[in-house]
């Protein structure tokens, strides 16, 4: 467990506050998890962002009438901190009985508070339900590898030694799997996700990639670090000209987290999947 997470509200009984309380946000430094992967803020081999979607966003108009919407938050992958998810939920709940002059005022407040917690500017977008309905759900790009016939016996920790590639072939392709699962490092609750790998490099053996993804099944870590670990393991193996790894996790507590890591500039369409 990340030492800072021990002091967060995650896994503890919490009082739900319904009036605006920005102090509820609990930042967790990324540095310790980066260090586990041999990284530092100065040596990150990727660009990226963590997209959060909130489906339980509500506040009051000056008249006292409630509003509901969907919040979309984009936190830079190189920000000093992540925001602990339960504290994020509690903070958003604190808006429920708080009046804002208009949506722009709420967005400005969210931007200020979340940027302060993350340590870098956070992008905020508030979508109406009609806008979300119009966007619908998306299918992941590329080939789904989930129907490949594999044998698995170890689920306790990620196993990069399972990954194989053909050094004699260079390809450019997109593949994805819906079989990503890990566990929350604090509560041990399951985190269900789908993951996409897009790259140009030595041809990746798809069955070995699926075996590797399944090896995360009992692994305990935050969403962001799981994606960073996958990125680094594939980068070492494939020596790619370009590489993108991103995951879309099933929501918990009204929030879903979607980490995106890439050697390229961020080109990400934040549209939910069927399980989100």
UniProtKB/Swiss-Prot annotation:
GO cellular component, one term: cytoplasm
Organism for this UniProt entry: Pseudomonas fluorescens (strain SBW25)
Protein name as catalogued: NADPH-dependent 7-cyano-7-deazaguanine reductase
Annotated binding of NADPH, by residue: 85-86, 252-253
Keywords: Cytoplasm, NADP, Oxidoreductase, Queuosine biosynthesis
Pfam families associated with the record: QueF, QueF_N
Tree of life domain: Bacteria
Gene, per the UniProt record: queF
Lineage summary: Bacteria, Pseudomonadati, Pseudomonadota, Gammaproteobacteria, Pseudomonadales
Subcellular location, record wording: Cytoplasm
InterPro entries associated with the record: GTP-CH-I_C/QueF, NADPH_dep_7-cyano-7-deazaG_red, QueF, QueF_N, QueF_type2
């Amino acid at each position: 467990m990340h030492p800072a997470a021990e002091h967060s509200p995650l896994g503890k009984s919490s009082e739900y506050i319904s009036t605006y309380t920005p102090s509820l946000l609990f930042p967790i430094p990324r540095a310790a998890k980066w260090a586990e992967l041999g990284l530092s803020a100065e040596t990150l081999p990727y660009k990226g962002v963590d997209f959060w979607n909130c489906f339980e966003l509500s506040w009051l108009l000056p008249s006292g009438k409630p509003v509901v919407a969907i919040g979309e938050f984009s936190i830079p992958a190189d920000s000093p901190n992540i925001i602990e998810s339960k504290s994020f939920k509690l903070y958003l709940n604190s808006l429920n009985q708080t009046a804002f002059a208009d949506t722009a005022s709420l967005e400005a407040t969210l931007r200020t508070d979340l940027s302060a917690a993350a340590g870098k500017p956070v992008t905020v977008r508030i979508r109406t339900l009609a806008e979300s309905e119009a966007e619908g759900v998306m299918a992941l790009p590329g080939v789904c590898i989930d129907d490949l016939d594999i044998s698995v016996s170890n689920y306790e920790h990620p196993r990069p030694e399972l990954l194989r590639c053909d050094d004699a072939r260079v390809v450019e392709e997109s593949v994805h799997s819906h079989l990503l699962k890990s566990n929350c490092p604090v509560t041990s609750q399951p985190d269900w996700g789908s993951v996409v790998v897009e790259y140009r490099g030595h041809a990746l053996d798809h069955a070995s990639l699926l075996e590797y993804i399944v090896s995360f099944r009992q692994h305990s870590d935050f969403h962001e670090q799981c994606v960073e670990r996958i990125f680094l393991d594939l980068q070492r193996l494939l020596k790619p000209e370009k590489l993108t790894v991103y995951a879309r996790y099933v929501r918990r507590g009204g929030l879903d987290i979607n980490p995106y890591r890439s050697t390229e500039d961020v080109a990400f369409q934040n549209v939910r999947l069927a399980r989100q």
